């Protein structure tokens, strides 16, 4: 879950140039090609085809890899500066909005100015018939005297029935968005994302378009028979993909925002998985569960560190499990990352050697086994992952009273918030020393 809103996102499928036409034909046939933006050529020579992210599923990606273009690279990325297509350049939504608002304002005897034009929104999020405007628009005092008719004009220009304007996330601990409803009688909206329905009130809850790559990845995991604990469930961003697509047997969903809990309960019902989920309302640090989880999701940024102790507590004592740890990592050249605090796409991986470290707290020896790391990863991501792994190993020993093995499986990029701030996810395998690694795992020795 996220602490801040973000601008509209253009998601693209990346592949090699020789497969571009096959990909385009398939995406057009499936009505997945984003016709408002141009196909982009990336710095490494790969080609990025803009897609309609809300309709794209992991099944589509698998079909591209296996049937449409066998042997092709098929990954998702976000285009930071997408170029409009020729069709879109006829007249953009922003241009239409500017023309309509200017005409309406001048009809009321108001002189149009460059300052007013600069105060119009340049980005927004569409939620069905509701448009959520960015916080940095309509700030001039003059607009106040033109309400509420102004909002009807704006809504008409954007082709919606309701309008809302966002502000910064409130520092209230529940990640409540500061959103004002400008036009309409309620803020409830619905999204269809990878075959999952999400309903929520935009004035009380948040929805992250930028997390689509991670939601698709979670949906593709094989969790059959597993019990999962989602420590920051929100409206079900990851809880629902784990249940609907990954096949988790049961999910314990923790959330302390009462408005998000209302939405989560509703979303579980409308997606037909309410019988496989228990909601734990309140502070997850006080969670009474223990020795139950095969997998724990810690989807909070900028850091989920406060949830690490309870994540260790809920892991099964006999065989352990996997932690999915979200984190914002600062990547400054020549500087060390600031742990509790890319647009690159994951490509090939290579194994890392086994490393044995001695616990400096006197808890004995902890075995850390290196898994795989993306060749696109920044070194700061890996250093943060190693630091997190060491801390988790120590926590596991403290919580369970015996040493555990920890192993970095992957470090996944989700998105970039700024040139030097990346949202990543660490997949960390945790096993008590008395249990064996899952069959097929090769523990490399130095």
From Swiss-Prot:
<dbReference type="InterPro" id="IPR056744">
    <property type="entry name" value="TRM5/TYW2-like_N"/>
</dbReference>
<dbReference type="Pfam" id="PF25132">
    <property type="entry name" value="TYW2_N"/>
</dbReference>
<dbReference type="Pfam" id="PF02475">
    <property type="entry name" value="TRM5-TYW2_MTfase"/>
</dbReference>
<dbReference type="Pfam" id="PF25133">
    <property type="entry name" value="TYW2_N_2"/>
</dbReference>
<protein>
    <recommendedName>
        <fullName>tRNA wybutosine-synthesizing protein 2 homolog</fullName>
        <ecNumber>2.5.1.114</ecNumber>
    </recommendedName>
</protein>
<feature type="binding site">
    <location>
        <position position="255"/>
    </location>
    <ligand>
        <name>S-adenosyl-L-methionine</name>
    </ligand>
</feature>
<dbReference type="InterPro" id="IPR056743">
    <property type="entry name" value="TRM5-TYW2-like_MTfase"/>
</dbReference>
<feature type="binding site">
    <location>
        <position position="208"/>
    </location>
    <ligand>
        <name>S-adenosyl-L-methionine</name>
    </ligand>
</feature>
<dbReference type="InterPro" id="IPR056745">
    <property type="entry name" value="TYW2_N"/>
</dbReference>
<dbReference type="InterPro" id="IPR030382">
    <property type="entry name" value="MeTrfase_TRM5/TYW2"/>
</dbReference>
<dbReference type="GO" id="GO:0006400">
    <property type="term" value="P:tRNA modification"/>
</dbReference>
<keyword id="KW-0949">S-adenosyl-L-methionine</keyword>
<dbReference type="GO" id="GO:0102522">
    <property type="term" value="F:tRNA 4-demethylwyosine alpha-amino-alpha-carboxypropyltransferase activity"/>
</dbReference>
<feature type="binding site">
    <location>
        <position position="215"/>
    </location>
    <ligand>
        <name>S-adenosyl-L-methionine</name>
    </ligand>
</feature>
<comment type="similarity">
    <text>Belongs to the class I-like SAM-binding methyltransferase superfamily. TRM5/TYW2 family.</text>
</comment>
<dbReference type="InterPro" id="IPR029063">
    <property type="entry name" value="SAM-dependent_MTases_sf"/>
</dbReference>
<keyword id="KW-0819">tRNA processing</keyword>
<feature type="binding site">
    <location>
        <begin position="283"/>
        <end position="284"/>
    </location>
    <ligand>
        <name>S-adenosyl-L-methionine</name>
    </ligand>
</feature>
<comment type="pathway">
    <text>tRNA modification; wybutosine-tRNA(Phe) biosynthesis.</text>
</comment>
<comment type="function">
    <text>S-adenosyl-L-methionine-dependent transferase that acts as a component of the wybutosine biosynthesis pathway. Wybutosine is a hyper modified guanosine with a tricyclic base found at the 3'-position adjacent to the anticodon of eukaryotic phenylalanine tRNA.</text>
</comment>
<keyword id="KW-0808">Transferase</keyword>
């Amino acid at each position: 879950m996220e602490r801040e809103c973000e601008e509209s996102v253009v998601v693209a499928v990346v592949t090699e140039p020789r497969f571009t036409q096959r990909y385009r034909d398939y995406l057009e046939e499936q009505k997945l090609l984003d016709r408002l933006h141009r196909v982009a050529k990336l710095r490494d020579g790969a080609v990025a085809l803009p897609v309609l992210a809300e309709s794209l599923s992991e099944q589509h990606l698998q079909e591209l890899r296996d049937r449409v273009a066998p042997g092709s690279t098929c990954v998702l990325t976000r285009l930071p500066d997408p170029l409009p297509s020729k069709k879109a350049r006829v007249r953009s939504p922003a241009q239409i909005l500017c023309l309509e608002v200017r005409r309406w304002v001048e009809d009321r005897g108001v002189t149009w100015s460059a300052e007013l034009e600069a105060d119009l929104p340049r980005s927004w999020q569409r939620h069905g018939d509701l448009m959520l405007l960015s916080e940095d628009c309509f700030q001039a005092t003059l607009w106040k005297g033109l309400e509420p008719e102004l909002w009807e004009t704006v809504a008409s220009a954007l082709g919606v029935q309701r309008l809302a304007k966002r502000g910064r996330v409130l520092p209230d601990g529940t990640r409540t968005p500061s959103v004002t409803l400008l036009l309409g009688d309620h803020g409830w909206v619905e999204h269809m994302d990878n075959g999952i329905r999400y309903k929520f009130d935009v004035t009380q809850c948040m929805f992250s378009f930028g997390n689509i790559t991670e939601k698709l990845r979670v949906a593709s995991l094989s969790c059959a028979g597993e019990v999962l604990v989602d420590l920051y469930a929100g409206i079900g961003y990851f809880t629902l993909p784990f249940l609907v697509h990954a096949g988790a047997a049961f999910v314990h969903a923790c959330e302390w925002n009462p408005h998000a809990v209302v939405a989560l309960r509703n979303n579980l019902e409308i997606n037909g998985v309410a019988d496989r989920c228990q909601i734990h309302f309140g502070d997850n640090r006080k969670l009474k569960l223990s020795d139950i989880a095969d997998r724990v999701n810690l989807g909070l940024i900028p850091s989920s560190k406060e949830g690490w102790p309870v994540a260790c507590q809920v892991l099964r004592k006999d065989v352990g499990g996997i932690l999915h740890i979200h984190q914002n990592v600062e990547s400054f050249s020549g500087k060390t990352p600031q742990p509790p605090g890319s647009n690159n796409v994951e490509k090939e991986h290579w194994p890392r050697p086994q490393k044995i470290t001695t616990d400096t707290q006197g808890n004995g020896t902890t075995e850390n086994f290196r898994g795989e790391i993306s060749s696109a990863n920044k070194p700061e991501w890996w250093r943060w992952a190693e630091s997190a792994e060491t801390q988790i190993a120590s926590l596991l020993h403290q919580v369970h009273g015996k040493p555990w093995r920890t192993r970095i499986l992957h470090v996944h990029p989700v998105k970039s918030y700024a040139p030097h701030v990346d949202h990543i996810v660490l997949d960390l395998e945790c096993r008590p020393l008395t249990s064996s690694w899952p069959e097929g795992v090769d523990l490399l020795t130095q």
